[in-house]
Regions:
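Intrinsic disorder at enzyme termini
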Residues: 148, 152-189
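Glycine-rich ThDP/TPP pyrophosphate-binding loop and its adjacent helix/strand module
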Residues: 2-142
Length: 189
C-alpha cells in the first residue's frame, strides 16, 4: 500500500452531465472502499471540515495507507471556456448555491460571529489584495514563459522513447515553423 491522499472535488457535474445520470449511488466514495482505500466524505464548502478531513487523512497516510477524500461541493462556474452551463442548469440554482453554500461566505460568517472580521475590514482587504494581484499580473506578463521544450522535463526519472520522439518532433517543427508562433514570449532553448 502507498501513503497517498486522493482528493476528489465532487462538484455534481462532469462537464454538462449531472452525477445523478452518471452512476448509481450518491458519490464515488464507495469505489474507494472497494479498492481497500480509506474514504472520508466531507462538505467541500466547509473550510474547517475540509481542513479536519485533510488532517485526518494525513494521519492515515502515516500508517502507509491510502485515503480518498471526497469533497461534496458545487461547480459555480462553467466547466471550461467551451462550456455554457446555462444550457443545463438555471441561474436560480447557481445563485442559490452561491449565496447559501459559497465556502468563502460561510467562513466569513464564522469569522464575523466570532468578532474576528467585519465588513469594513473585508472591503479594505479586498482592495489591498486586488491591487497586489494586479501588480503580480503585470510583473508576470514581463517575464518570459519557460522554454517550450521544458514541458518534457521532470515528468519521468528517465524519459521514455516515445516522449523523446515527441520532443524531437516539436523541436523540428519549431525550427521549421517557429516564425508562425510567438516564440519571443518564451525563454530560448
Amino acid at each position: 500500500k502507498c501513503p497517498i491522499i486522493f482528493f476528489c472535488r465532487n462538484n455534481g457535474y462532469a462537464i454538462s452531465t449531472p452525477t445523478t445520470e452518471q452512476y448509481g449511488g450518491d458519490g464515488i466514495g464507495g469505489k474507494g472502499i472497494g479498492y481497500g482505500i480509506h474514504v472520508i466524505r466531507v462538505d467541500g464548502n466547509d473550510l474547517i471540515a475540509v481542513y479536519n478531513a485533510t488532517k485526518a487523512a494525513r494521519e492515515i497516510t502515516e500508517q502507509n495507507e491510502p485515503v480518498l477524500i471526497e469533497a461534496m461541493t458545487y461547480r459555480l462556474g462553467h466547466h471550461s471556456t467551451s462550456d455554457d452551463s446555462s444550457a443545463y442548469r438555471c441561474s436560480e440554482e447557481v445563485n442559490t448555491w452561491y449565496q447559501k453554500n459559497n465556502p468563502i461566505v460561510r467562513f466569513r460568517i464564522i469569522l464575523e460571529n466570532k468578532g474576528w472580521w467585519n465588513n469594513e475590514e473585508d472591503i479594505t482587504y479586498q482592495k489591498k489584495i486586488r491591487k497586489e494581484i494586479m501588480e503580480a499580473f503585470l510583473h508576470a506578463e514581463k517575464i518570459p514563459k519557460p522554454n517550450i521544450l521544458s514541458m518534457f522535463d521532470d515528468v519521468y526519472k528517465e524519459m521514455p522513447k516515445i516522449l523523446q520522439e515527441q520532443r524531437d518532433e516539436l523541436r523540428e517543427h519549431l525550427n521549421k515553423y517557429g516564425k508562425y508562433y510567438p516564440m519571443k514570449n518564451f525563454e530560448d532553448s
